[in-house]
């Protein structure tokens, strides 16, 4: 389960360009739940994912994975618990590879980080159908 509790994030705090992105934001994804994050340009979708993955630090609140606080953990520690698959593989970490090939990295190169647990090759056609909708 992924839980965000009372997340707050401001860009350019204290300046005339200050932007409050999140204030007291709560969000929970139950184990096995499939979630889509949708919204207009600039609404915070990418920032939310970057906060979850640790690319952007939060100003307040905490991020829990299965009840364990991962807020502020180093990237290599957080990567053992959470990762992402890009909607458009051309913008992902290996743009020349298909989505399946990108996911297979978790089975191979990511195995020592514990990333392979989320990839089930037996469900490839199901993943493909979900992602094509």
How would you name each of these model-derived features?
Residues 96-112:
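Q-loop/switch helix immediately C-terminal to the Walker
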Residues 118-133:
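Conserved ABC ATPase "signature" region
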């Amino acid at each position: 389960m992924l839980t965000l509790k009372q997340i707050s994030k401001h860009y350019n705090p204290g300046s005339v360009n200050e932007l409050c992105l999140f204030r007291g934001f709560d969000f929970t994804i139950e184990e096995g739940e499939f979630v889509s994050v949708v919204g207009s340009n600039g609404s915070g979708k990418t920032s939310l994912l970057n906060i979850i993955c640790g690319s952007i630090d939060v100003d307040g609140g905490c991020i829990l994975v299965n009840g364990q606080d991962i807020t502020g953990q180093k990237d290599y520690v957080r990567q053992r618990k959470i990762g992402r698959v890009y909607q458009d593989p051309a913008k992902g970490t290996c743009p020349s590879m298909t989505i399946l090939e990108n996911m297979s990295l978790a089975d191979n190169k990511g195995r020592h980080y514990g990333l392979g647990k989320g990839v089930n090759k037996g469900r490839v056609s199901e993943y493909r159908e979900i992602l094509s909708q």
